[in-house]
């Protein structure tokens, strides 16, 4: 004779050190991402093995494969983490100046170069190493580049004058400005931040001002 299982015998996983199993799993994943950001940013993706990542995170391979299917999947997560942090940082600085183009541009540029200088390892991953591993990043690299371009378009559109170009031409101009900014950051990192940040901000500010006048952006007329 079979009997129905007593539901009271089915117990959830017990918390360990005050954390649930899901919380511990999330913490391990975050530790692996943080380790990957450090190692990929310092040594480059091709030089870093899964064993090195696990040692840096103080975790075993079992926990690596619990969180990620491959080293490339971890690379994508690390890149996404860094770009998200950068976007949030510049938005915080730019938001108070959305109606004033020169102040908006200056705030965004100061925080861009400031983020790079404060976080050289993260910046190397985001600005330099990402260029070398675009194939491994798949669609993520292009998506984040487009996000940066879209952010520039969104904050600029409300400030445009009547002589604004078509959206397609406007997007090309935005891509050109973003590309120039990334190239400046790459060169600054490669020269170990030799050029004073004030010179970088002023020079890039003038570039944005020229584009702003061409677009008829209020504040640059």
Task: Describe each PLM feature range.
Residues 77, 92-121, 201:
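Hydrophobic alpha-helical connector segments
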Residues 117-136, 153-156, 186-187:
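Amphipathic alpha-helical segments used for helix-helix packing
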Residues 31, 35-43, 85, 89-93, ...:
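Solvent-exposed, amphipathic alpha-helical segments
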Residues 1-27, 216-221:
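N-terminal intrinsically disordered/low-complexity leader segments
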Residues 31, 39-73, 77:
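Helix-turn-helix
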Residues 93-97, 126-130, 159, 188-192:
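Secondary-structure edge/capping motif, primarily at the C-terminal ends of alpha-helices
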Residues 84, 88, 135-161, 171-183, ...:
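Amphipathic alpha-helical packing segments from all-alpha helical-bundle domains
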Residues 25-36, 53, 78-86:
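Generic hydrophobic, amphipathic alpha-helix propensity
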């Amino acid at each position: 004779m079979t009997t129905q299982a007593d539901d009271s015998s089915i117990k959830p996983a017990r918390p360990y050190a005050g954390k649930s199993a899901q919380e511990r799993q999330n913490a391990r994943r975050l530790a692996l991402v943080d380790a990957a950001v450090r190692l990929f940013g310092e040594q480059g993706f091709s030089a870093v093995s899964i064993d090195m990542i696990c040692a840096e995170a103080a975790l075993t391979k079992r926990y690596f494969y619990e969180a990620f299917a491959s080293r490339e999947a971890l690379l994508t997560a690390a890149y996404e983490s860094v770009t998200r942090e950068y976007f949030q940082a510049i938005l915080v600085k730019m938001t108070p100046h959305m109606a004033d183009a020169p102040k908006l541009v200056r705030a965004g540029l100061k925080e861009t170069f400031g983020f790079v200088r404060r976080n050289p390892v993260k910046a190397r991953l985001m600005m330099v190493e990402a260029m070398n591993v675009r194939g491994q990043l798949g669609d993520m690299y292009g998506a984040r580049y487009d996000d940066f371009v879209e952010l520039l378009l969104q904050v600029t559109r409300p400030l445009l004058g009547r002589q604004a170009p078509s959206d397609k031409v406007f997007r090309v101009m935005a891509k050109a400005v973003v590309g120039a900014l990334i190239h400046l950051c790459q060169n600054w990192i490669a020269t170990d931040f030799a050029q004073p940040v004030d010179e970088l901000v002023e020079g890039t500010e003038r570039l944005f001002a020229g584009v702003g006048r061409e677009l008829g952006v209020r504040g640059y007329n």
